């Protein structure tokens, strides 16, 4: 099955007190986005799209030039992760499954991305999660009785019970093409991220 990768790099990095977007902060001498794109390239996607904020196109383009052909898409307004993915939809090749990841996860490895790529051929959505001792600041994973992921609840939207959940969203999700547009159509302005 063909697949596309969407790398979200429109985050402003305000918590880092920097004018540079979060994905362009440096780690081991290279922007985090560069580390991510290097690993993405190893998975041999049919297409790679980087979503950026309008004011940072040139900065993102400079980082992306070292990778294979990459399409750049601007998220016109900072309306969160779901909206950033929505911005990429018109550019995506039809029929491709989609792997979405954040541009600020420099420790991700191609092996993990390949497992998600292969796994989404058998299911509609795969969410890469992890458990943290202190999950403050992260979206929590809500599961049903059969252990299926039912929702990702952002920290700012968590009630007291949900704040006790220590399984969090890594920001890396694989979708079958048939379901991503349907899911994004249900995204409303009330979603903070």
Short names for language-model regions:
Residues 1-18:
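N-terminal nucleotide-binding beta1-loop-alpha1 segment
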Residues 5-7, 49-50, 99-100, 125-128:
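Structural beta-sheet core signal
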Residues 19-37:
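Short catalytic helix/loop segments, enriched in acidic residues and glycine
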Residues 26, 107, 174:
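Short aromatic/basic micro-patch
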Residues 31-118:
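Conserved N-terminal catalytic core of the sugar/cofactor nucleotidyltransferase
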Residues 111-136:
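Conserved donor-nucleotide/metal-binding helix-loop-beta segment in metal-dependent transferases, i.e.
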Residues 142-148:
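Short acidic-glycine loop/turn motifs at beta-strand connectors
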Residues 149-193:
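Catalytic-core segments of class I nucleotidyltransferases/pyrophosphorylases
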């Amino acid at each position: 099955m063909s697949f596309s990768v969407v790398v979200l790099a429109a985050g402003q990095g305000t918590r880092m007190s920097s004018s540079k977007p979060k994905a362009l902060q440096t780690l081991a001498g290279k922007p985090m986005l560069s580390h991510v794109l290097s690993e993405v390239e190893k998975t041999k996607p049919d297409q790679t799209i980087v979503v950026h904020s309008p004011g940072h196109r040139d900065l993102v383009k400079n980082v992306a030039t070292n990778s294979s052909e990459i399409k750049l898409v601007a998220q016109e307004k900072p309306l969160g992760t779901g909206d950033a993915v929505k911005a990429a939809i018109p550019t995506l090749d039809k029929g491709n499954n989609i792997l979405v990841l954040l541009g600020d996860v420099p420790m991700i490895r191609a092996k993990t991305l390949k497992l998600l790529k292969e796994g989404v051929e058998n299911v509609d959505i795969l969410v890469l999660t992890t458990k943290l001792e202190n999950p403050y600041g992260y979206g929590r994973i809500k599961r049903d009785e059969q252990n299926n992921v039912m929702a990702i609840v952002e920290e700012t939207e968590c009630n007291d019970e949900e704040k006790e959940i220590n399984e969090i969203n890594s920001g890396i999700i694989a979708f079958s093409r048939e379901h991503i547009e349907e899911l994004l159509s249900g995204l409303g302005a009330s979603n903070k991220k």
